């Protein structure tokens, strides 16, 4: 057995753990300000939960899912993203829309590990169901901006936004794009050739140099907007302007999954290298009905916690400990009782089990102790303690039953 983590996973220690929890807690707190309700789904689902929703041409389905057959012969997949599982939850539990749902947890994708991208990663996830009004899009993007501000990274993260329009827009644009790209079919990358028929819009998001040159002159989706699609997108952009949220319209932004329509957006930064998206999401009005639910317009976004951790400066404000140093047999026996009492009063206590007084005092100093409590058998008999302030060096005797008040 190899004593190392599996490639694409990482341990979380000490200060990094505090940073992780800070992100979780901040996201949870902000979600409640916007009326989101917390939910949690299992980390694995029946495989069809994802294959039905993510589209058979997406990279997640074709390359990245962790899928296995369980002992009952069922195909099971570790969650690669949240939306599919949340939609399953919405339908199975018969939740009444409109409703806003917030979730946090791990997800799994078989990808090439790099900065900001691991095979096990964690996401904060926001989904709004049952609201077709563009104000829902505006509010959700505003929430994302609010979070970035809370994390202190809003200045280096920029909003890119696009609209894929409604079903009619997507159908007409898809035909026009295929017609254009077929002229260059043999020059496209292998991935883009595979996508040409199944999901040509994904080619717009290609990172291949030749693909980029080809799509630079491709038809623009905005030329195919229906009147309704154009009005919807204008309403979203006007709302962002009213809130003072700067944005750039990126006509090549399509997102990586097949279920999106109308608004799609990413908050991006150059500080993460190739993995520039901090938050990403969009509208998916037809997804719920496509998997057997009622027609339920929806919009959502997710953010990778590990990516946010790469960007934020956060250090947990560490409480200084109370150090207990007993001297003598009876005092040693009583030390745990004292430590337990102080901890139940909300104090951080270190009880040093052994060593000379000099050694223990040195360790108390290294631990940046606030005060040291010293007592031997004599103090135990007189129900007193010596308390030493480690900042001033002041020492005094106090009554044992007044310990908490004197700290």
From Swiss-Prot:
Enzyme class: ligase
Enzymatic reactions: tRNA(His) + L-histidine + ATP = L-histidyl-tRNA(His) + AMP + diphosphate + H(+)
TM regions (residue ranges): none
S-S bridge residues: none
Signal peptide interval: none
Pfam families: HGTP_anticodon, tRNA-synt_His
Subcellular compartments: Cytoplasm
Gene Ontology cellular component annotations, sorted alphabetically: cytoplasm
Principal subcellular localisation of the protein: cytoplasm
InterPro entries named in the record: aa-tRNA-synth_II, aa-tRNA-synth_II/BPL/LPL, Anticodon-bd, Anticodon-bd_dom_sf, His-tRNA-ligase, HisRS-like_core, HisRS/HisZ, HisRS_anticodon
Record keywords: Aminoacyl-tRNA synthetase, ATP-binding, Cytoplasm, Ligase, Nucleotide-binding, Protein biosynthesis
UniProt-listed SUPFAM superfamilies: Class II aaRS ABD-related, Class II aaRS and biotin synthetases
The protein's Enzyme Commission number: 6.1.1.21
Domain of life: Bacteria
GO biological process: histidyl-tRNA aminoacylation
Subunit structure: Homodimer.
UniProt family annotation: Belongs to the class-II aminoacyl-tRNA synthetase family.
NCBIfam families on file: hisS
Protein name: Histidine--tRNA ligase
Organism for this UniProt entry: Wolbachia pipientis subsp. Culex pipiens (strain wPip)
Gene for this chain: hisS
């Amino acid at each position: 057995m190899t004593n190392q983590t599996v490639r694409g996973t990482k341990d979380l220690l000490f200060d990094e753990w505090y940073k992780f929890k800070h992100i979780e807690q901040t996201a949870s707190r902000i979600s409640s300000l916007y009326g989101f309700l917390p939910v949690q789904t299992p980390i694995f689902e029946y495989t069809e939960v994802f294959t039905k929703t993510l589209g058979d041409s997406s990279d997640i389905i074709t390359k990245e899912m962790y899928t296995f057959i369980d002992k009952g012969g069922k195909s099971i997949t570790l969650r690669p993203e949240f939306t599919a599982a949340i939609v399953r939850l919405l339908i199975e539990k018969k939740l009444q829309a409109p409703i806003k749902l917030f979730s946090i947890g791990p997800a799994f994708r078989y990808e090439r590990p790099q900065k900001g991208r691991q095979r096990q990663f964690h996401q904060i996830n926001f989904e709004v169901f049952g609201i077709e009004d563009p104000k829902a899009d505006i509010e959700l993007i505003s929430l994302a901006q609010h979070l970035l501000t809370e994390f202190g990274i809003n200045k280096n993260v920029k909003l890119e936004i696009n609209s894929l329009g409604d079903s009619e827009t997507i159908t007409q644009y898809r035909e026009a794009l295929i017609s254009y790209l077929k002229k260059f079919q043999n020059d496209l990358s292998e991935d883009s050739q595979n996508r040409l028929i199944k999901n040509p819009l994904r080619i717009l998001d290609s990172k291949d140099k030749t693909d980029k040159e080809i799509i630079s002159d491709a038809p623009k989706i905005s030329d195919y907007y229906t009147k309704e699609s154009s009005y919807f997108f204008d309403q979203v952009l006007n709302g962002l302007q009213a809130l003072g949220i700067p944005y750039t319209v990126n006509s090549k932004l399509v997102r990586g999954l097949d279920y999106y329509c109308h608004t799609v957006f990413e908050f991006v930064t150059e500080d993460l290298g190739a993995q520039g998206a901090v938050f990403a999401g969009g509208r998916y009005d037809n997804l719920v009905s496509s998997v057997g639910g009622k027609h339920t317009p929806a919009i959502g976004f997710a953010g990778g916690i590990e990516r946010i951790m790469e960007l934020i400066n956060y250090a947990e404000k560490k409480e200084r400990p109370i150090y207990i140093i007993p001297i003598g047999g009876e005092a040693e026996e009583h030390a745990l009782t004292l430590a337990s009492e102080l901890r139940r009063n909300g104090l951080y206590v270190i009880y040093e089990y052994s060593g000379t007084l000099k050694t223990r005092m040195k360790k108390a100093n290294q631990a940046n102790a606030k005060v040291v409590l010293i007592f031997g058998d004599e103090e135990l008999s007189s129900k007193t303690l010596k308390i030493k302030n480690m900042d001033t060096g002041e020492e005094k005797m106090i009554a044992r039953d007044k310990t908490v008040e004197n700290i």
